[in-house]
């Protein structure tokens, strides 16, 4: 990608400067904790990659484990050998071993998991689809939860748990 320095800064997860803000990052314009990011292993939605081979930043959030657009679980391991996906790959959609993630069979996610991931996508400003919005409405989350900004929503989901 040929981006100017300012463009790179805009898409990076920058530290937020200031007193007691060392552990905060800027994620797509929203303040989140550094702990909210998934540094260990990448996750992908094969169906999303099949439609458009781009990396969605929302997949970098640690609590995002399902794709609300396709109602499926994200992959973080290769199905055959169960090895972790690597950050360094031949292409966004291709494993170092040559496996094309777009060819993987998707696994349906639990509707409640889809609903909470829809809330996260929405708070992060990412598209999530009409079906996901309907699943979110049927889940019965309080309006106050759905009105939270991304950082507080991630904290609440983390502390309340499943």
Predicted segments, located by residue:
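C-terminal accessory regions
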Residues: 1-162
